[in-house]
């Protein structure tokens, strides 16, 4: 689950980290009033969406008057912001963050992520702030410095000092960086984060460290024990199909292709997408119905896949282990009848009751294409999609 920048900064402030005074506003009038609360004569106004690249898309502005703030809010609130990280529709802007302006002398990067390889929370720091860390990792990996947290003792001051020295910080800045590092480390563990970024972490004109931006992703599997963070969820930022799928315990991710995929098991789903690509097709989604798939969930899965107007054909790939292929076949038949499927459906069944499932599909009288293997299924669905 992602948080907005203003929500991330609220958490930073709770842990004693230096952030700009700011207010998240839902109306142009609120935005103008926020400037009065903050004071000064220059403010930064930012669209709040779950995507990067806001500045280049016009979603961040330096405002020198309340009229500029009001105009910015009127222009963006209720509209969608399209960035390089969103799809063509963009993300809806429901709040504008108005905050005080900071004079920047230098930009740094500080982030943390759960590293599955080392099974540790790993902090990353770099002197190359303000740019994508992926770009830095690709072009100049030697400029990224790391510190892995011991799961028994958590963040340690010596780790912060080592990173501070590598970033070229001096004097009071080292103390400030240590406080930020320790706070972020504790926050990461307390709040079950999966990813945390401050990009940029800036050195101000006065020589102090300041958290200018904030990006947080929370481990969705831990939300049951984070009631406060659950309340921060903004459903307006979710793909409606993904939200619908979550209600039925389906793992669905929308993609840009034209071949709908319904598979049981995440690994098999990824393999199915790969083989569709291998044979010249383009998956429209990732959809894992899980090991405990029911007839009702299969029906809902079909509805979700077909709600995407780009879908020209559907591939159902089921390996029956826990789940029975005949039950999946009943779900497919029921879904095709209920939804009124107008696109070709290719089905590959293997494993538990696969023969019985295949017979049920054959006896249904519906226009369902049976595949003999995964390769055959991929070839058939690509051919069917091209024919549409």
Curated annotation (Swiss-Prot):
Cellular component annotations (GO), alphabetically ordered: cytosol; succinate-CoA ligase complex
Positions of Mg(2+) binding: 199, 213
Residues annotated as binding ATP: 46, 53-55, 99, 102, 107
Top-level lineage group: Bacteria
Cofactor note: Binds 1 Mg(2+) ion per subunit.
EC identifiers of the protein: 6.2.1.5
Cofactor(s) the record lists: Mg(2+)
Binding site for substrate: 264, 321-323
Catalytic activity: succinate + ATP + CoA = succinyl-CoA + ADP + phosphate; GTP + succinate + CoA = succinyl-CoA + GDP + phosphate
Residue ranges of coiled coil: none
InterPro entries for the chain: ATP-grasp, ATP-grasp_succ-CoA_synth-type, ATP_grasp_subdomain_1, Succ-CoA_synthase_bsu_CS, SUCC_ACL_C, Succ_CoA_ligase-like_bsu, Succinyl-CoA_synth-like
Keyword ATP-binding in annotation: yes
Annotated pathway: Carbohydrate metabolism; tricarboxylic acid cycle; succinate from succinyl-CoA (ligase route): step 1/1
Keywords carried by this UniProt record: ATP-binding, Ligase, Magnesium, Metal-binding, Nucleotide-binding, Tricarboxylic acid cycle
Pfam family membership, one: Ligase_CoA
Gene3D superfamilies: ATP-grasp fold, A domain, ATP-grasp fold, B domain, Succinyl-CoA synthetase domains
GO biological process, one term: tricarboxylic acid cycle
A GO molecular-function annotation: magnesium ion binding
Enzyme class: ligase
Subunit field text: Heterotetramer of two alpha and two beta subunits.
Family according to the record: Belongs to the succinate/malate CoA ligase beta subunit family.
Entries under HAMAP family matching the protein: Succ_CoA_beta
Matches recorded under PANTHER family: SUCCINATE--COA LIGASE [GDP-FORMING] SUBUNIT BETA, MITOCHONDRIAL, SUCCINYL-COA SYNTHETASE BETA CHAIN
Role according to the record: Succinyl-CoA synthetase functions in the citric acid cycle (TCA), coupling the hydrolysis of succinyl-CoA to the synthesis of either ATP or GTP and thus represents the only step of substrate-level phosphorylation in the TCA. The beta subunit provides nucleotide specificity of the enzyme and binds the substrate succinate, while the binding sites for coenzyme A and phosphate are found in the alpha subunit.
Listed name of the protein: Succinate--CoA ligase [ADP-forming] subunit beta
Organism: Aeromonas hydrophila subsp. hydrophila (strain ATCC 7966 / DSM 30187 / BCRC 13018 / CCUG 14551 / JCM 1027 / KCTC 2358 / NCIMB 9240 / NCTC 8049)
């Amino acid at each position: 689950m992602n948080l907005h920048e203003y929500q991330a900064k609220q958490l930073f402030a709770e842990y004693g980290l230096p952030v700009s005074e700011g207010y998240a506003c839902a109306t142009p009038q609120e935005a103008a009033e926020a400037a009065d609360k903050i004071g000064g004569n220059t403010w930064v106004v930012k669209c709040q969406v779950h995507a990067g690249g806001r500045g280049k898309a016009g979603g961040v502005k330096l405002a020198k008057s309340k009229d500029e703030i009001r105009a910015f809010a009127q222009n963006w609130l209720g509209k969608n912001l399209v960035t390089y990280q969103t799809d063509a529709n963009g993300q809806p802007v429901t709040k504008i963050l108005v905050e005080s302006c900071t004079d920047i002398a230098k930009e740094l990067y500080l982030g943390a992520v759960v590293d599955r390889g080392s099974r540790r929370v790993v902090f990353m720091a770099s002197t190359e702030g303000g740019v994508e860390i992926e770009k830095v990792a690709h072009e100049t990996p030697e400029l990224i410095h790391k510190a892995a947290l011991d799961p028994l003792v958590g963040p340690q001051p010596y780790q912060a000092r080592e990173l501070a020295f590598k970033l070229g910080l001096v004097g009071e800045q080292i103390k400030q960086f240590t406080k930020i590092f320790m706070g972020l480390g504790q926050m990461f563990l307390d709040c079950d984060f999966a990813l945390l970024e401050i990009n940029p972490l800036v050195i101000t004109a006065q020589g102090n460290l300041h958290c200018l931006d904030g990006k947080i992703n929370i481990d969705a599997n831990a939300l049951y024990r984070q009631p406060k963070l659950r309340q921060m969820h903004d459903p307006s930022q979710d793909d409606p199909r993904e939200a619908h799928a979550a209600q039925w315990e389906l793992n669905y991710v929308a993609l840009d292709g034209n071949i709908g995929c319904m598979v049981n098991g995440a690994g098999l789903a990824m393999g199915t997408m790969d083989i569709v690509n291998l044979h010249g097709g383009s998956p429209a989604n990732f959809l894992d119905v899980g090991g405990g798939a029911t007839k009702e969930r299969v029906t809902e899965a079909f509805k979700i896949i077909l709600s995407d107007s780009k879908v020209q054909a559907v591939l159902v790939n089921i390996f029956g282990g826990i789940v029975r292929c005949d039950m999946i076949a009943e779900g497919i038949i029921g879904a095709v009848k209920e939804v009124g499927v107008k696109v070709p459906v290719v089905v590959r069944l293997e494993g538990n009751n696969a023969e019985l499932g295949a017979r049920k599909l054959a006896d249904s009288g519906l226009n369902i294409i049976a595949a003999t293997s995964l390769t055959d299924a991929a070839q058939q669905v690509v051919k069917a999609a091209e024919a549409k």
